[in-house]
């Protein structure tokens, strides 16, 4: 999908910072800035590298100051807000256009001199390539000077003082290093060293309103200058009257050597190296679209966006899924919810298997990891649903894997893990996760929040859901049924019979205890006692009881639930986490950490449940083909959301009352994954005219 922006999109610096872009390297690293080339968040960097994939991430190249010289005049092309607004760099005044088709490019103009800028990350490596090209009329003396701003610090740090960057030449390239990180630079420009200058007072306008520290900085250690357009050195000139400046950054010396060999084969033309890397990334993204098999342009964009969240995990020598950029790492619950859309829906079968193996390795007392903290080794297990969703992900993988792709040893190990999860949950495990005598699953106590509505602010739980949450018990029934079917396939008759009996018990209790008088579902039941006020709140969690492969809900009741969701929770970009008619409804997400936490699951719109809603509409429709067409029409309206905020991505959340502006992570895995999955169901239903 192509995105074109022009001068009307950056009438002011603040307007220009409303749109951003995201590039990823498949290691957890990324490149992200606004479309005017500014850092509007502390997490914006040109090169955020993963020293250990995917969660030991360092801000290596923060941004670049860009000055175009025309004769004796100088024009600053980059834009950046500063704490003292009079210092703001307003290069957007010279920016004519921005184009993004998976990779960003800019066109600037000053005094008739045109500057184009392109950049790309290199998938699978911590590398960044940037190219500037100047076009000037004959006889016009123009050149560009760039001043990189480096971080060399952990992604979330805001150093007031920095460790000195050591710089030296190594095989005709610049080698920069600190105790923790090192970086190579190849360039066809002239590097001019300068005394290290620390920049502390960038203003990050998109952090301030969210209650985050809205400032940060970096340091400058050199300038890089291009050739002049009037020079006669043909090696630094391409096309008619144009000059190139290329910067190739990398953290792996072997990778840099490969690029040097490529450069030497093209008569030391670093532009050819850049073009190779640029085209390589374009082709990679195109292949993802083709492999997805999706038809509509919107769905094909979602496929690329979903694949962007796939990442390597070094600790298991395998794959995982980044929950959201720029804030989150790979989380258990998010990974399992996004699993289908980020792997199976785009034909990434090997990645799917590897992700399951990654989490199997960390399973403890029947619980899958909830969180791998940024830059730390310990794993957090405070989740009840990740394990149940793992079993669902395993089932979906086994339904998709071909006989040729089948790995009997993996399947046997995975089924053993799934069986152990059921066993631990039955007898009870950590965090008060246990099966009650009625067969239903209860979890949580004290300050531990174990469902996706897990916010905790100090000792305050804005959405306490201790007891028996509705979606957890839908997942529980589904997981028991899946393990039953897998054991049946293995000929385990006794175990199969026991799980069959258990599934019937769960279903009977669920329908009796969770069904409200009007046919909709209670959100959560107290562990011991009758439904309370929290039970009766209308939340989006009941939608997940309709979309599991094994569901307890019949069509008649499903239609009642869908009607309530449509009436009180539905928006075109997601479902509200709480009915807008509830006295506790928060119409806006923003402000201090406390204000944001209190609103997070109290009406804020979440994109990912929308996929489940659309799939349920098709599944329980009397006319699935017609319903699927209507769903496709609604999904195509996501073009507007894809063009807002981070281009080509769907955000984590939106305001509850008027969901016009994205909030939270600007690129969320389960958002794009679940909407892509809804596309798959809808396109299939249109073709075959049946329920999914």
Walk through the language-model features, giving the residues of each.
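Acidic, mature catalytic/reactive cores of soluble proteins
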Residues: 1-692
